[in-house]
Amino acid sequence: MNQQASFQQEEWGIGGTKNEVNRTIAISMGDDMKFKPEKINIKVGETIRFEIKNNGKLLHEMVIGTKQVLDKHAEMMVKHPNMEHDEPYMAHISPGKKGEIIWKFNRAGSFDFACLIAGHYQAGMVGKIEVQQ
């Protein structure tokens, strides 16, 4: 039986599958509250596998979204730091570990990615994704 994952369309794209991946982008993050790279260029229609490595000693995450969505989510994380959340556009990565996000960018625009763990977003742990035709 062939089961297809069911993903919800978001303003910044939709969850992707391994079979759809067009390219892989390595992202590293650490306790300096920075992502490397901090800016990513993508073409509309590309499905990207983000291979994310946490080089720090603290828990970090990568969450993709619009600035408005990330601002709202970051506010919730400050109020409820142990809140469970798991969406295809986010990955929580323990110190020294790796994780991945597979995401299809089917809409053009400027989007953000961030670590929304309490205090990390506020410290500037954010990056930019430009999706163009």
Region roles according to the model:
Residues M1-T17:
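N-terminal low-complexity, Pro/Thr/Ser-rich intrinsically disordered segments
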Residues W12, T17-T47:
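N-terminal edge beta-strand
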Residues M1, H60, H73, H120:
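Histidine-centered active-site/metal-ligand motif
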